[in-house]
């Protein structure tokens, strides 16, 4: 069956993931002394980071592709029966938009945390992103347990949530020298799930609206 434009746009989630992964892997080359095992990914995009220019080039497709992907996914799931599932995806979309706009407006002013206004706002954006991420993934997992047609979404959401928890808990447990390792579990969870949503849309297509079957006359 021929793929629709909406389905094809779902592949932008994969493009977004690859753009972000390229930045995480190659941006440290422009940051002398950067220790990926100990430092956060956000240090690479700090306002005064030497790697900022390269980071911006490598992530040129990241934000725009991620928000377009999750937006067309919201369009593509309109016909699904499970309202709970749709709410979960809408919350995830809200998280992606918050992340795309918030982190662009308020990057860290310095590597680590310098305490400036934009650093405080960066933390506020992070808190909103974390809460929306967890809420959306939990709702999608619950909806998949109730509606088996959403099971594959639930499995992907469970993997993403597990990665987030590993990152969040790991950052509290592991020594500072390993902070960057566990932190990367968290940062790749959301963009990975976004890619999964886009692939679902591309492979499964748009859900058709469910219409009530007219009752037959006696």
Q: What do the PLM-derived regions correspond to, one by one?
A:
Residues 140-218:
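Terminal transmembrane helical module of multi-pass membrane proteins
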Residues 99-139:
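Membrane-proximal helix-loop-helix units in multi-pass membrane proteins
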Residues 89-104, 158-167:
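Small-polar-interrupted transmembrane alpha-helices in polytopic inner-membrane proteins
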Residues 17-36:
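Alpha-helical transmembrane segments of multi-pass membrane proteins
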Residues 61-87, 135-145, 209:
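Internal transmembrane alpha-helix with an interfacial aromatic "cap," most often the third helix
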């Amino acid at each position: 069956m021929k793929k629709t434009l909406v389905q094809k746009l779902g592949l932008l989630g994969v493009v977004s993931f690859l753009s972000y992964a390229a930045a995480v892997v190659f941006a440290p080359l422009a940051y002398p002394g950067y220790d990926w095992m100990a430092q956060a990914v956000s240090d690479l995009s700090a306002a005064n980071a030497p790697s900022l220019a390269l980071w911006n080039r490598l992530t040129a497709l990241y934000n725009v592709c991620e928000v377009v992907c999750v937006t067309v996914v919201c369009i593509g799931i309109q016909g699904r029966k499970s309202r709970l599932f749709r709410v979960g995806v809408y919350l995830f979309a809200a998280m992606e938009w918050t992340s795309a706009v918030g982190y662009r407006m308020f990057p860290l002013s310095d590597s680590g945390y310098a305490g400036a206004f934009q650093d405080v706002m960066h933390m506020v954006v992070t808190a909103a992103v974390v809460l929306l991420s967890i809420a959306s993934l939990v709702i999608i997992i619950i909806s998949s347990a109730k509606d088996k047609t959403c099971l594959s979404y639930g499995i992907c959401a469970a993997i993403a949530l597990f990665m987030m928890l590993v990152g969040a808990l790991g950052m509290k447990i592991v020594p500072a020298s390993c902070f960057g390792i566990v932190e990367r579990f968290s940062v790749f969870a959301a963009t990975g799930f976004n890619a999964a949503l886009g692939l679902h849309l591309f492979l499964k297509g748009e859900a058709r609206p469910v219409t009530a079957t007219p009752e037959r006359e006696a």
